């Protein structure tokens, strides 16, 4: 499978445009932490795991995660999640590694995978309104 096809397939899924199903009951629980913000809590995770392909220098599928505004805008196909609905997000499912191997993010060898606790923190940020 070509890299372009794999990349397109992932971003369609990650941006919520795929009919791909995932079992939301397998998502790590939402973090109990209150007041989760992009700058303080989420940006450091993205910087560590996502900026290599979705940062200031490179934006695969036009997805940029290095600012709150860009993250909320999403990539080529729009935002990857709906505020308040982390359990429905294929973006969350992809970093939780619940999608197919070519849809899970970050890809093997491209960044550090999110821990269950970090996925829970991402879920809390989305559920608390993405501030």
Which role fits each region the language model picked out?
Residues 18-131:
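Aromatic- and Gly/Pro-enriched helix-to-coil junctions and flexible linker segments
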